[in-house]
């Protein structure tokens, strides 16, 4: 039961972490692009 819960938490956290990193990189890219202009 605990193993299933932990695996569910991990599987839920991985996409959220990847999405957060992607959004952060995208915002930094947009900010740098605006500064270059």
From Swiss-Prot:
The keyword Endoplasmic reticulum does not apply. GO terms for biological process: cytochrome complex assembly; photosynthesis. Signal peptide: none annotated. Its main location: plastid. One of its GO terms (cellular component) is chloroplast thylakoid membrane. Belongs to the PetG family. Keywords: Chloroplast, Electron transport, Membrane, Photosynthesis, Plastid, Thylakoid, Transmembrane, Transmembrane helix, Transport. The lineage of its organism: Eukaryota, Viridiplantae, Chlorophyta, Nephroselmidophyceae, Nephroselmidales. It is a single-pass membrane protein. The chain crosses the membrane at residues 5-25. The keyword Electron transport applies. Pfam families: PetG (PF02529). InterPro entries: Cyt_6/f_cplx_su5, Cyt_6/f_cplx_su5_sf. GO terms for molecular function: electron transporter, transferring electrons within cytochrome b6/f complex of photosystem II activity. Component of the cytochrome b6-f complex, which mediates electron transfer between photosystem II (PSII) and photosystem I (PSI), cyclic electron flow around PSI, and state transitions. PetG is required for either the stability or assembly of the cytochrome b6-f complex. HAMAP family: Cytb6_f_PetG (MF_00432). This is Cytochrome b6-f complex subunit 5. It is found in: Plastid, Chloroplast thylakoid membrane. The 4 large subunits of the cytochrome b6-f complex are cytochrome b6, subunit IV (17 kDa polypeptide, PetD), cytochrome f and the Rieske protein, while the 4 small subunits are PetG, PetL, PetM and PetN. The complex functions as a dimer.
């Amino acid at each position: 039961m605990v193993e299933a819960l932990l695996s569910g938490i991990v599987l839920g956290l991985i996409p959220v972490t990847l999405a957060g990193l992607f959004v952060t990189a995208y915002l930094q890219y947009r900010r740098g692009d605006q500064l270059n202009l």
